[in-house]
């Protein structure tokens, strides 16, 4: 059977008619808010059959621009507004209701209302275009473990100091829809639900730490640590040295600290650790005894049985501390004798533990004489006999006082305080004012090659921070050791005034020499123990000591 291209069999035509009928039944009635225009399925049928004179054109939906004086009342029909209002009311009531089963009841009523309203608008019995909404989730529940750790907050009416969070009371707000049926998005940025929520704080049953202070609760956005790291450093220190210094952690607390201008931080920490509180009254340092103890200023007199106030006269702290250093600890005498060459052992003499004279005190290397504590002279013949290429000859302390500074009495009493001007024995601050302190030394090196470089590496804090100073050539050593082919180098340590009045100096010597073909280097570290010296700068000057 042959069929022409223009003709179609009847069975194909019947199938096309059935498909067209099904399409017409499935097409919904489209409503527009334009006056005088209504688009429905009949318009599509007429356009397809060609029986209508007017065809659907997008230009017919356009309007000329005009000034609108008042809102068009027929833009949103009353039935449509009422329908969306009822829909929002039903959603809100269902979100607050604990039983989710009521959702099916009001959805049927809302569907019936929508059906009647659409019929009144369209004038037909065809089912309207239905907006399918997702089922509402039940009210969120909090796990029991979380409830035990963070109890539920009280209502604001019962507690005046109540602080609550809106997100805790309403974890999931019900959705709100626009009049057009779209979901309304909140303009407020809510917190991520993956982060832990901050519980409500109650003043009566607050969480407290072991020391009794209220514990800091984690906030929502910004988090601060409860310990603040603090480092103390000099004004001219390098960042590398500051990074190696010790770090002090100041724990944050809610207790108010008293304002004490005359109390040192070290003394304050000692008093607080012993249970005493420091106060400052008329620039006099006094201590207040804790509860349960008698006041130290009021002592009962056994003779008359009356309490008297023992008010002591104010004395200089510098005088009291220096007097304490001379009287409290008697000089320790030792019967041990130091043998030349045995520099590996610690030296114990009458001034090893109680230095009250300004000077240098060796700890682990031999010296010829200790009559002048400001100058340490070593036995160079011992080092020369051991065929050492570099060794220390002499170490001296130089102190220069500015007479113009001390002539002015006002400047003497107004001595500036440094950040570490107080030593462990409680010496008053300001000993560095008006003084220049230097440590100078001499080094003997073997003349191997012409190019020489001698460096002294030293530290004040047990090698936590190190410093280096390069030595300067002075002359040959024929005047001291003739025929030994030695050279003399000189070095100066000029940061003595920046350390504590009783510092511990430790240093070693590095010697390198070279020519065009080879290079040699040697170390003098006192047989692997380094040179250790105690530097005392806050004691009395011995007038009988020999001039440096």
UniProtKB/Swiss-Prot annotation:
Modified residue annotations for Phosphothreonine: 52
Gene3D superfamilies: Carbohydrate binding type-21 domain (2.60.40.2440)
Residue ranges of the region described as Disordered: 1-54, 118-143, 191-212, 293-346
One of the Pfam families matching this protein, by short name: CBM_21
Origin superkingdom: Eukaryota
Biased composition, class Basic and acidic residues, residue ranges: 1-23
Domain spans labelled CBM21: 419-534
Keywords: Phosphoprotein
Sequence positions bearing Phosphoserine: 51, 155, 221, 238
UniProt-recorded Gene Ontology molecular function terms: glycogen binding; protein phosphatase 1 binding; protein phosphatase regulator activity
Any one GO CC term of the record: protein phosphatase type 1 complex
GO BP term, example: glycogen metabolic process
Record's subunit section: Interacts with phosphatase 1 (GLC7).
Misc note: Present with 125 molecules/cell in log phase SD medium.
Protein name per Swiss-Prot or TrEMBL: GLC7-interacting protein 2
